């Protein structure tokens, strides 16, 4: 038995099956306690996201963990088994490190997964299903994920449209904290853009949307101002950056509207990023002297270049994960040796205490001290060499030269 990781992810299973094996947030506490009861160590952590469900256990058989998963979700082995992956020992540790660093994600190097793994670990601690071994494993994993992000370029280059749009703004403006941003739309992409902007210090954001209530809901989270699409001409002159992503069939920002805004800005430059398909901003806006217009195609070429850069960084990251997983297992093995040494010393001390007690009793009864000491020495010697003698004899009879050589080395018989 050893560390075990089993899972299903976006590479191995359809959305339909991933939904069936997912754990609801309000049930994961009890689920981890149930899973931990199937292990000898009582240690278990469940990671459940939209793209993966993974179970990590210590001192457990993989087959038992799989059976528990199938039973918990009332799924047949035939449905689950073909989509499962399993790792043991060092490979299980390495897999956790790869997952946490974003090396196994749908978007290579994405940082969100690390936060999700940390949340799962916290929930496991709250459930009481983490002890020394898995606590050390997860803490090491978080350090390794940080090391990978620090020592490689795995997360440096934008590989999502939203991130690429904000990265472009960072290249053009020396500091985003003093810029005013107009976001057009209030869907998932614009929400992600707003999150990236806030993370980069943007304080002044205006969100324009056809449905004002949706814009207001988003603004509550990011401290932005909500307006309708009809109000855009009033706010456009104040905008240093405009990022648009709506489902409108026709352009929302025309050349005339932008030209008028630029005049009011006294021709201070304006960055416009159109990530909508079809376009939200008329292509002719690019002809204006102080307007810098980029489309989703421009961003896509940047993303493709950055993906190549991330793949190179991933090769370095894989080496780090491999090395750190090996070092963690070295720590595990050192614990095993400590336990063995402690057990051997305890056994030897018990033999010594028993024989000394007998010798003391004989001396108390008037026994000859020299004879008692000689008997003690002989019996102690025989007791201590009994197990090694049996092992040497067995290795010789079986012709096991490898074991015989190791035993001689351990017993110091080959010293000059």
Curated annotation (Swiss-Prot):
Family, as annotated: Belongs to the glutamyl-tRNA reductase family.
Additional free-text comment from the UniProt record: During catalysis, the active site Cys acts as a nucleophile attacking the alpha-carbonyl group of tRNA-bound glutamate with the formation of a thioester intermediate between enzyme and glutamate, and the concomitant release of tRNA(Glu). The thioester intermediate is finally reduced by direct hydride transfer from NADPH, to form the product GSA.
Top-tier EC class: oxidoreductase
Entry note about domains: Possesses an unusual extended V-shaped dimeric structure with each monomer consisting of three distinct domains arranged along a curved 'spinal' alpha-helix. The N-terminal catalytic domain specifically recognizes the glutamate moiety of the substrate. The second domain is the NADPH-binding domain, and the third C-terminal domain is responsible for dimerization.
Natural source organism: Shewanella halifaxensis (strain HAW-EB4)
PANTHER family listed in its UniProt record: GLUTAMYL-TRNA REDUCTASE
Catalytic activity: (S)-4-amino-5-oxopentanoate + tRNA(Glu) + NADP(+) = L-glutamyl-tRNA(Glu) + NADPH + H(+)
Quaternary structure (record): Homodimer.
Role description: Catalyzes the NADPH-dependent reduction of glutamyl-tRNA(Glu) to glutamate 1-semialdehyde (GSA).
Record EC number: 1.2.1.70
GO BP annotations, alphabetical order: protoporphyrinogen IX biosynthetic process from glutamate
Highest taxon in the source lineage: Bacteria
Residues the record lists as binding substrate: 49-52, 105, 110-112, 116
The protein's name in its UniProt record: Glutamyl-tRNA reductase
Binding site for NADP(+): 185-190
Annotated site location: Important for activity: 95
Any GO molecular function: NADP binding
Entry's transmembrane regions: none
Pathway connected to this protein: Porphyrin-containing compound metabolism; protoporphyrin-IX biosynthesis; 5-aminolevulinate from L-glutamyl-tRNA(Glu): step 1/2
NCBIfam families from the UniProt entry: hemA
């Amino acid at each position: 038995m050893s560390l075990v990781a089993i899972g299903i992810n976006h590479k191995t299973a359809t959305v339909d099956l991933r939904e069936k094996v997912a754990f609801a947030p309000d049930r994961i506490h009890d689920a981890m306690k149930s899973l931990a009861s199937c292990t000898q160590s009582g240690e278990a952590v469940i990671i459940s996201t939209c793209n993966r469900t993974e179970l990590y256990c210590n001192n457990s058989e993989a087959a038992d963990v799989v059976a528990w998963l199938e039973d918990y979700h009332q799924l047949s082995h035939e449905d689950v088994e073909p989509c499962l992956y399993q790792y043991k020992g060092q490979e299980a540790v390495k897999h956790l490190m790869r997952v946490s660093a974003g090396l196994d994600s749908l978007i290579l190097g994405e940082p969100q997964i690390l936060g999700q793994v940390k949340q799962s670990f916290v929930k496991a601690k709250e459930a009481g299903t983490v002890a020394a071994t898995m606590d050390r494993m997860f803490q090491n994993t978080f350090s390794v994920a940080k090391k990978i992000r620090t020592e490689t370029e795995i997360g440096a280059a934008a590989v999502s449209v939203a991130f690429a749009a904000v990265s472009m703004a960072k290249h053009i403006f020396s500091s985003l904290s003093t810029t005013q941003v107009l976001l057009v739309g209030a869907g998932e992409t614009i929400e992600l853009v707003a999150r990236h902007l806030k993370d980069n210090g943007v304080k002044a954001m205006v969100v324009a949307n056809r449905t004002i209530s949706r814009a207001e809901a988003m603004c509550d989270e990011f401290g932005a101002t909500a307006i309708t699409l009809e109000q855009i001409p009033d706010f456009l002159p104040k905008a240093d950056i405009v990022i648009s992503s709506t489902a409108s069939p026709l352009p929302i920002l025309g050349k005339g509207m932008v030209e008028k805004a630029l005049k009011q800005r006294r021709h201070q430059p304006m960055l416009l990023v159109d990530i909508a398909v079809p376009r939200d901003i008329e292509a002719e806006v690019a002809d204006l002297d102080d307007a810098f217009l980029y489309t989703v195609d421009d961003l896509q070429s940047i993303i493709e270049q950055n993906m190549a850069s991330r793949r190179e960084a991933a090769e370095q990251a894989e080496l780090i994960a491999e090395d750190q997983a090996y070092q963690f297992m070295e720590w595990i093995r050192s614990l095993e040796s400590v336990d063995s040494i402690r057990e051997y010393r305890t056994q030897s001390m018990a033999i010594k205490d028993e024989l000394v007690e007998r010798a003391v009793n004989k001396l108390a009864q008037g026994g000859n001290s020299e004879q008692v000491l000689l008997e003690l020495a002989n019996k102690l010697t025989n007791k201590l060499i009994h197990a090694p003698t049996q092992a040497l004899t067995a290795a010789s009879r079986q012709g096991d030269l490898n074991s015989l050589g190791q035993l001689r080395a351990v017993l110091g018989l080959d010293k000059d």
